[in-house]
Regions:
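N-terminal cap/leader regions of alpha/beta-hydrolase-fold enzymes
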Residues: 1-253, 261-262, 267
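C-terminal and inter-domain tail/linker signature
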Residues: 164, 200, 204-404
Length: 404
């Protein structure tokens, strides 16, 4: 998706990644102390999928060109050496050159943001204070606490992501950062419990996937609100479900998704990871194995920065074997109505993943395979109460009727 380009004179270069559309808002990606390595290039490609024109400049080029280090002890020592020799003034000059290159590129069709990790997190803060950018995000921004005299110069929205146990930005430093932005509605400082420095770096021992995903969504929120791009996620999801349940076209359904999507029906762990796997699932096990009389009744829809949470009633007659919901269970011809929740995540204007939840016990009760007299479970009543809140609550709590 991306490749190296020349940024300025004398060999200053950077890795540029473009969105599928070929153009979009600009995003300057500032690397950690390991250079423009595989993780940085993957991050650039990821944000390109989100719709950005991404440029990751080689900030160590004056010492050694196109540095790409791993996390081994020898490379960590080399990284520390680069940091000791780094000329912050000249690096910020190089960032200004990179911003100008990005701003004037014909692919960049909108405003500019800056995103940084580690060393790059601090540089993102300084860039927001000293340059003309429209949004900034910094991960693990060690050293920001020593530059808070510039906080007042930051006029754009900014978010900082800090691990709770990051010793480089410990309690007092974190409190100083928070105090510097008191009263700023466009500034967010997020702390991630139990996480250390580099929690979003998949190559570090302290990588925390859940925290990294949360931080990514928060970062997207900053950028999308400030610089775009904006997509009609509801319309994209409606088209996906139309192709899935209406047209029943597996190939067309896949065209609404990213190149390597995944779907997980949580109660039965059915779905697929990757294009070929998921295409096979849709074509052979989902679309032809969903009852013809299936109805999706919308209850509520919450639309976020990069995802939709859809609450619905899923209604059908169990007249075929439903591989994805009731694998191996012969048709009972019973009617089923269940509350179902779909959490759908997007990358740019494509679906990236789906997490689908429902109460499998309620399904089993309604088709006669589970006796509600023996377990604290309910059948179609769960669907009925979703539509009518006046129906009785707490019927499964035996002591509820005793008083109160």
């Amino acid at each position: 998706m991306g490749g190296w380009i020349d940024i300025g004179h004398e060999g200053f270069s950077g890795y540029m990644a473009l969105p599928e559309s070929g153009s979009g808002p600009g995003l300057l990606l500032l690397a950690d102390a390991f250079g423009v390595d595989g993780v940085v290039r993957e991050t650039a490609d990821l944000y390109a999928e989100e719709g950005y024109v991404v440029l990751a400049p080689d900030l160590f080029w004056r010492m050694e060109r196109r540095v790409s280090l791993d996390r081994t002890e020898p490379d960590r020592a080399r990284s520390a050496g680069f940091l000791r020799r780094l000329d912050l003034h000249r690096v910020l000059q190089d960032i200004a050159v990179a911003l100008a290159r990005l701003r004037t590129s014909f692919e960049c069709s909108g405003k500019l943001g800056v995103l940084g990790f580690g060393l790059g997190g601090r540089l993102a803060f300084l860039t927001a204070a000293r340059a003309d950018v429209d949004a900034a995000v910094g991960y693990d921004p060690a050293g920001v606490q020593d530059a808070l005299d510039e906080a007042g110069a930051v006029s754009c929205p900014i978010a900082l992501h800090i691990g709770e146990t990051d010793e480089a930005i410990a309690g007092a430093a974190r409190e100083a950062i928070l105090a510097s932005f008191t009263g700023r509605a466009d500034v967010a400082v997020y702390t991630y419990p139990g996480c250390g420095h580099g929690f979003a770096d998949r190559l570090r021992p302290g990588f925390d996937k859940a925290a990294a995903l949360m931080a990514h969504s928060r970062s997207l929120s900053v950028f999308k609100q400030a610089i775009g791009p904006q997509y009609d996620l509801s319309a994209l999801w409606e088209e996906h479900t139309r192709l899935e349940f209406g047209a029943r076209d597996a190939e067309a359904t896949m065209q609404t998704m990213v190149a390597e999507p995944y779907v997980n029906h949580i109660p039965t762990m059915t779905g697929g990871v990757g294009y070929q796997n998921l295409l096979r699932f849709y074509r052979d096990f989902f679309i032809p194995r969903t009852p013809a009389d299936t109805r999706l009744i919308p209850i509520s829809r919450t639309i976020g920065t990069d995802r939709i949470v859809d609450e619905m009633l899923f209604c059908f007659t169990h007249d075929i074997e439903i591989d994805w919901m009731l694998p191996g269970v012969a048709p009972t011809r019973r009617r089923v109505e269940i509350p179902l929740v779909a959490i759908v995540r997007f990358r740019g204007d494509k679906l990236y993943n789906e997490h689908i939840y429902w109460d499998q016990a309620s399904v089993l009760v309604q088709i006669g395979l589970l006796d509600p007299r023996l377990l604290p479970v309910a059948g179609v009543a769960t669907a009925r109460k979703l539509l009518d809140e006046s129906l009785p609550s707490n019927g499964l709590i035996r002591r509820w009727a005793e008083g109160g």
